[in-house]
Design a protein with these regions (language model features):
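Iron-sulfur cluster-binding cysteine motifs and their immediate structural context
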Residues: 13, 26, 217-241, 258-285
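Structural motif
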Residues: 244-250
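Auxiliary alpha/beta "docking" domains used to position bulky ligands
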Residues: 1-211, 250
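Generic recognition of stable, solvent-exposed alpha-helical segments in well-folded globular domains
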Residues: 2, 6, 105, 109, ...
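Short, flexible, mixed-charge acidic loops at enzyme active sites
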Residues: 82-87, 235, 302-305
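Alpha-helical scaffold domains
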Residues: 250-345
Length: 345
């Protein structure tokens, strides 16, 4: 356990909000849920999710020699919302620099420290939303949270989730990493990263029980009905999928239902009671530029490709591309026009 504890402490020193370790094994139960989801075609046009499934379920096939999974969480909750918070909205995770680059850089530092501590060149793999890895499943296995009804990982440090002193003791025993959250922030606005290590490390936590209870705020709030049932999302109806991954026409959808979201969507997270524990992130690279903060409705409608490249040069918004974002802007604008006509009738 000494090395495991040391890794968690080093992760904390590097600025990660939580860290946990689990043994590399087959995700049998999780694979059943994924297969059922795929059978329904709810992945939409994300065909990459149907490939390399064996590697997705068994990390040892993805990175030969892997014995332990180190999972880290990094807070991205912003200090302020872009624009007026009502029109032409961007998901909070994309306010600043591309999280893939930021997290991988920090995780390389963690790996270098582990290699220095062990005296071994480990040749480990770093994954940040860029390979067939069931990220949230491993975060749960590492004791860093539970999956909410909105399918997001909800990080719940011991002090936030335990309701009674006896429960405090029980969760501390189950989940010793819980108390290591730097600022005791919780909720779902976290990036997830993984180190696949060829080291046999002691596990530092166990899966937490689901704590959604009878709350259905996320399901009730989804304007497109993407959350058909608890813990299940139909990507084909999801605003995030439609504005980022989907490349076709949005003509068959109701622009008003998109509620002003032009890249991604945070509705099911914003309404989650656990996100009252969110705290503003302190990562300089996640802060939006002054140019982005100054953008308003007319600016978005007149957006040029040159302006797009300036605003989102190192941003995750590049995944949608200029043409994709323009499509979304025009689609949302058509809804505003429709609403204006309706109000004047």
């Amino acid at each position: 356990m000494e090395l495991s504890k040391w890794i968690i402490e080093e992760a904390e020193q590097l600025g990660f909000d939580a860290c946990g370790i689990a043994n590399a094994t087959v995700l049998e139960e999780e694979s059943v849920h994924v297969e059922q989801w795929l059978e329904k075609g709810h992945e939409g046009e994300m065909s990459y999710l149907t490939r390399n499934k064996e590697k997705r379920y068994d990390p040892r096939l993805l990175a030969e020699g892997t014995k332990s999974i180190v999972t880290v969480l990094y807070n991205y909750f912003p200090k302020q919302l872009l624009g007026d918070g009502k029109h032409f909205k961007i998901a909070k995770y994309a306010y600043g620099a591309d999280y893939h680059d930021v997290l991988k850089r920090k995780m390389r530092q963690l790996l270098e420290r582990i290699e220095e501590q062990t005296g071994k060149l480990l040749g480990s793999r770093i994954f940040v939303d860029s390979a067939p890895v069931l990220e949230r499943a491993w975060a749960v296995r590492c004791g860093l949270g539970f999956i909410g009804k909105n399918t997001a990982l909800i990080h719940s440090p011991m002090s936030l989730t335990a309701s009674r002193s006896q429960h405090n003791k029980e969760e501390l025993d189950i989940n010793p990493t819980a108390r290591r959250s730097r600022r005791q922030c919780g909720g779902s606005f976290f990036f997830i990263g993984h180190l696949f290590l060829p080291l046999e490390l002691e596990e530092t936590g166990k899966p937490l029980p689901n704590r959604c209870g009878r709350c259905n705020k996320c399901i009730d709030a989804c304007p497109t009905g993407a959350l058909e049932t608890p813990f299940h999302i139909d990507a084909r109806k999801c605003i995030s999928y439609l504005t980022i991954e989907y490349k076709g026409s949005l003509a068959d959808h109701n622009p008003t239902a998109f509620d002003g979201w032009m890249y991604g969507c945070d509705i099911c997270q914003d309404v989650c009671p656990y996100n009252r524990f969110s705290l503003p992130n302190t990562e300089p690279e996640f802060q939006p530029s002054e140019q982005l903060l100054a953008m308003r409705g007319d600016d978005w409608k007149k957006l040029t490709e040159t302006e797009f490249e300036t605003l989102f040069k190192h941003s995750a918004v590049q995944r949608a591309g200029f043409e994709g974002l323009k499509r979304n802007i025009e689609f949302i604008s058509s809804g505003e026009l429709r609403d204006a006509v309706h109000d004047n009738e």
